[in-house]
Amino acid sequence: MQEFTNPFPIGSSSLIHCMTNEISCEMLANGILALGCKPVMADDSREVLDFTKQSQALFINLGHLSAEKEKAIRMAASYANQSSLPMVVDAVGVTTSSIRKSLVKDLLDYRPTVLKGNMSEIRSLVGLKHHGVGVDASAKDQETEDLLQVLKDWCQTYPGMSFLVTGPKDLIVSKNQVAVLENGCTELDWITGTGDLVGALTAVFLSQGKTGFEASCLAVSYLNIAAEKIVVQGMGLEEFRYQVLNQLSLLRRDENWLDTIKGEVYE
């Protein structure tokens, strides 16, 4: 396993602009605070640039789209591209919605630092066969061999972008590196918003100067390792959700948490 540099303690309390959905915004805000940064969530086109200009990273999540939000997303993404602001785009629901898929493809022109999605979403986006329903990945879409080759090709077209593909095994692909990471637990599927949270944590690590590849590996591993520490048989949904946020604030105190990352990194 490649030696990643511990991002903690956070050097500066960065402002993370999350253009996300109403369902998971509270979890994302608390997750960002738990790592030592500050969240803001503005998706009104009349003010979106005011907040984006003050931010150190931008997270765009398509989980609850509207015409007004799309307008604001395009404005923020354009600014991020022009000002070299790190940007994460989470392609939620592109397996089902042609509007969302079209928007994500347009956002590629703004050169996001990280493009995130589950296995079905990313397969759909790059033109591979998929079985995703709604915003959920299908167990039939977990084969990575064909996807990996296509993503390597896409990284030649978008050399500054990394792909973060979540699943039972998380796949992170950049122009020069590939990671297959294996931390996590099925209990994370019990509660909504954990996938969105990975994107927000990626933005946090980008705000600290990490590359798209490093930030993606750190974010998905951090959440998964935090969850592994609290898996208790018989725990109810609300208690598990509470403990996830609790562990996000505690794990950063462990100087050796990086040693528990499972998986491989290839050059």
UniProtKB/Swiss-Prot annotation:
SUPFAM superfamilies: Ribokinase-like. One of its GO terms (biological process) is thiamine diphosphate biosynthetic process. CDD domains: THZ_kinase. Its EC number is 2.7.1.50. Substrate binds at residues 41, 193. The keyword Kinase applies. Its cofactor is Mg(2+). Pathway: Cofactor biosynthesis; thiamine diphosphate biosynthesis; 4-methyl-5-(2-phosphoethyl)-thiazole from 5-(2-hydroxyethyl)-4-methylthiazole: step 1/1. ATP binds at residues 116, 166. The keyword Manganese does not apply. It is an enzyme of class 2 (transferase). InterPro entries: Hyethyz_kinase, Ribokinase-like. It catalyses: 5-(2-hydroxyethyl)-4-methylthiazole + ATP = 4-methyl-5-(2-phosphooxyethyl)-thiazole + ADP + H(+). GO terms for molecular function: ATP binding; hydroxyethylthiazole kinase activity; magnesium ion binding. Keywords: ATP-binding, Kinase, Magnesium, Metal-binding, Nucleotide-binding, Thiamine biosynthesis, Transferase. HAMAP family: Thz_kinase. Belongs to the Thz kinase family. Catalyzes the phosphorylation of the hydroxyl group of 4-methyl-5-beta-hydroxyethylthiazole (THZ). This is Hydroxyethylthiazole kinase 2. It comes from Streptococcus pneumoniae (strain Hungary19A-6). The gene is thiM2.
